[in-house]
């Protein structure tokens, strides 16, 4: 009797786990299409066709004695096909009510943090930030972790223009 109950519980657990895991496993997996210096062009196929985006990782992270996790700066074409939207993705949750700043060659842009990501506060700032990235050489991102740690990341902008040109042709 006890063995039957254990087998039933195991079978139900496996069924529940597969029901939960199936949607996650069904998500499209991005693959790198091409490397453009510091930036990679990635694509994945979904229900709406092929989606592309460009992504880079920091060349420097501060403070040095903190576990930053995996951090990325991503730029993707807007679904409308007109322009791009930039996004910071951090390896940790950001402090609510804080502000993230992106500085490209002395020009500063504000990002709104939510969870572990940040986007420009106004959609109209997307084009200005992307234009600055295309003409700039380096970008710094400053953020505050949920624990209150001030963090700073430096990204190379080498290759971002070519990567964005290719991303705009994708799909």
Question: Predicted regions span which residues?
Answer:
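Short, intrinsically disordered, low-complexity terminal/loop segments
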Residues: 1-2, 171
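Bacterial N-terminal signal peptides that target proteins for export
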Residues: 2-13
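A generic "folded-domain core" signal
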Residues: 25-171
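N-terminal signal peptide c-region/cleavage motif recognized by signal peptidases
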Residues: 21-23
